[in-house]
Each structure stands twice: as structure tokens, then as C-alpha cells.
């Protein structure tokens, strides 16, 4: 999944870079471009809202309280274990870096 986010980030930066380096347009073209950008933005917000509503509806349909409790319990146990092992690793690393003093 990290590659997808990186690809999206690169594409967004590329588009923004091209926009910054683009030639200056006459005033009339800027107004047309602005309205096109506004339409595109409104369209994207509409799609985002639709996807968000569909995801919320799907979540509400499949919500199981027992599963939610199990997930919370697993999360709590795993974070406790990770924090314990991270503490042990940190102590070992610090003792290696300090050496015999």
C-alpha cells in the first residue's frame, strides 16, 4: 500500500509543479480555468461524499458488538506487548551504546 500512496503523492506534486511553472494566461482564460477547477472540485467532493456515505452505511450494516469488543481486546493486548518489547529493546540499545561505565 505504501507504493500507491507514494505514486499518488508524486503525481500530485508533478501536477502542482507543472501548474507553478506554467505560462501566465490572459485574464479571460483564468476565469474559465477557475470555473473549470471549481467544477472539478465540486465533482470530487460529490464523489467523496458518496463514497463516505456508502462506507458508513456498509459499516452500520455489518457492525457486530461482539466483534468490536474482540477487536478492542486484541488491540489492547497487542499494544501492551509491543510497548513491553519496545521498552526492552530500548534498554538493550542504551546499554550497548553506553558500554561498561
UniProtKB/Swiss-Prot annotation:
UniProt keyword list: Chylomicron, Glycoprotein, HDL, LDL, Lipid degradation, Lipid metabolism, Lipid transport, Lipoprotein, Secreted, Sialic acid, Signal, Transport, VLDL
Gene Ontology molecular function: any one: phospholipase binding
Chain intervals for the UniProt region annotation (Lipoprotein lipase cofactor): 78-101
PANTHER family: APOLIPOPROTEIN C-II
Residues covered by region (Lipid binding): 66-74
Protein name, UniProt field: Apolipoprotein C-II
Similarity comment: family membership: Belongs to the apolipoprotein C2 family.
One GO cellular component term: high-density lipoprotein particle
Subcellular location: Secreted
UniProt function note: Component of chylomicrons, very low-density lipoproteins (VLDL), low-density lipoproteins (LDL), and high-density lipoproteins (HDL) in plasma. Plays an important role in lipoprotein metabolism as an activator of lipoprotein lipase. Both proapolipoprotein C-II and apolipoprotein C-II can activate lipoprotein lipase.
Signal peptide coordinates: 1-22
PTM summary: Proapolipoprotein C-II is synthesized as a sialic acid containing glycoprotein which is subsequently desialylated prior to its proteolytic processing. Proapolipoprotein C-II, the major form found in plasma undergoes proteolytic cleavage of its N-terminal hexapeptide to generate apolipoprotein C-II, which occurs as the minor form in plasma.
GO aspect biological process, one term: lipid transport
Listed Gene3D superfamilies: Apolipoprotein C-II
Organism: Phoca vitulina
Amino acid at each position: 500500500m505504501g507504493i500507491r500512496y507514494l505514486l499518488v503523492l508524486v503525481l500530485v506534486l508533478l501536477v502542482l509543479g507543472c501548474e507553478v511553472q506554467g505560462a501566465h494566461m490572459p485574464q479571460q482564460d483564468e476565469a474559465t480555468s477557475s470555473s473549470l477547477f471549481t467544477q472539478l472540485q465540486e465533482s470530487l467532493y460529490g464523489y467523496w461524499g458518496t463514497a463516505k456515505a456508502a462506507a458508513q452505511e456498509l459499516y452500520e450494516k455489518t457492525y457486530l458488538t461482539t466483534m468490536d469488543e474482540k477487536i478492542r481486546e486484541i488491540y489492547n493486548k497487542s499494544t501492551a506487548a509491543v510497548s513491553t518489547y519496545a521498552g526492552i529493546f530500548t534498554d538493550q540499545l542504551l546499554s550497548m551504546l553506553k558500554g561498561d561505565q
